[in-house]
């Protein structure tokens, strides 16, 4: 029986750099203000990084500010309550449940839902250990649907 996933060795490596690149025209304060402005518009942290890279020419926030993007958001009380990767997995699980409601005999979707929900539980236990989630937090599909649709959060 084959392994489920390949090893995945192919990726680009960031160049080693101690300070900000010389061609970046933004100062530390300007980048932090841009991060705050984009967070107020409702962008998640990964989208903030992509917008800064693509539209403003900021390669890495950490190189310019000396701090991670989520640390900047946390200082300004704008960090999301649930970590972004966990929230994205919950969104995926909600979409699969919605699909299974329409097509209940879709066995591969059921298996996919099991895998996504087990990944949610593993990630949640890690975040509880590191203190990013409260100890009493637990995954509930009904609450997840409310979170994803925006009714709760």
UniProtKB/Swiss-Prot annotation:
Cellular component aspect of the GO annotation: cytosolic small ribosomal subunit
BP GO annotations: translation
Stored InterPro entries: Ribosomal_uS15 (IPR000589), Ribosomal_uS15_arc_euk (IPR023029), Ribosomal_uS15_N (IPR012606), uS15_NS1_RNA-bd_sf (IPR009068)
Keywords: Ribonucleoprotein, Ribosomal protein
GO molecular function terms listed in the Swiss-Prot or TrEMBL record: small ribosomal subunit rRNA binding; structural constituent of ribosome
Assigned protein family: Belongs to the universal ribosomal protein uS15 family.
Record's subunit section: Part of the 30S ribosomal subunit.
Protein name as it appears in the record: Small ribosomal subunit protein uS15
Lineage of the organism: Archaea, Thermoproteota, Thermoprotei, Sulfolobales, Sulfolobaceae
Gene: rps15
């Amino acid at each position: 029986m084959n392994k489920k996933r390949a090893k995945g060795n192919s990726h680009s490596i960031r160049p080693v750099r101690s300070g900000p690149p010389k061609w970046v025209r933004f100062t530390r304060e300007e980048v932090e203000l841009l991060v705050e402005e984009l967070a107020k518009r409702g962008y998640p942290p990964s989208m903030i990084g992509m917008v800064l890279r693509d539209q403003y020419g900021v390669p890495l926030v950490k190189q310019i500010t000396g701090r991670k993007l989520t640390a900047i958001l946390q200082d300004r009380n704008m960090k999301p309550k649930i970590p972004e990767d966990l929230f994205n997995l919950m969104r995926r699980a909600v979409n699969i449940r919605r699909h299974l409601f329409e097509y209940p005999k879709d066995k591969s979707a059921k298996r996919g839902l099991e895998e996504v929900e087990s990944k949610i539980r593993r990630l949640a236990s890690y975040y509880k250990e590191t203190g990013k989630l409260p100890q009493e937090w637990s995954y509930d599909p009904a609450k997840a649907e409310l979170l994803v649709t925006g009714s709760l959060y």
